[in-house]
Regions:
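Repeat-mediated protein-protein interaction surfaces in helical alpha-solenoids
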Residues: 1-11, 24-37, 89-90
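TPR/TPR-like alpha-solenoid helical repeat scaffolds
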Residues: 9-10, 52-61, 77-97
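A conserved position within tetratricopeptide repeats
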Residues: 10, 36-39, 43, 72, ...
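Generic helix N-cap/helix-start motif at coil->alpha-helix transitions
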Residues: 13-19, 43-48
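Inward-facing hydrophobic residues that define packing positions of alpha-helical scaffold repeats
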Residues: 20, 32, 39-40, 68, ...
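Residue-level signature for tetratricopeptide repeat
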Residues: 21-25, 53-55
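Acidic, aromatic-enriched beta-alpha/helix-loop junctions
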Residues: 39, 45, 49-56
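TPR/TPR-like (Sel1-like) alpha-helical repeat modules
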Residues: 43-45, 57-79
Length: 97
């Protein structure tokens, strides 16, 4: 599945995906709050990566740095749209392999 195909999924289809991908899908639908609420208490590294991106998007860089550390990923220097696309690509690849 491509990122473009992922974005076009509907809300019912994404419920079968890991929490991090569900949260990212909601961000693609421009629903930051739903995205954040899905991963706010998640403890896995993929969710922490999405959480970092969301706080970076929000402008809360200190909190974003905390979540990048939790995710084991370096702090992104990409544009927000490119970072989101890269996260989506990696997470989609994890479920399709």
């Amino acid at each position: 599945m491509t990122v473009e195909e992922f974005i076009k999924q509907n809300a019912e289809q994404i419920k079968t995906y890991p929490l991090a991908l569900q949260a990212l899908w909601h961000d693609y639908q421009e629903n930051w709050h739903q995205s954040h609420s899905l991963i706010d208490t998640a403890g896995d590294k993929d969710s922490a990566w999405v959480h970092a991106y969301l706080h970076r998007k929000e402008g809360d860089i200190g909190n974003a740095r905390y979540w990048y550390r939790r995710s084991g990923k370096p702090e992104s220097r990409l544009s927000l749209s490119r970072e989101r696309q890269e996260i989506a690509r990696v997470l989609i690849q994890e479920i399709t392999n």
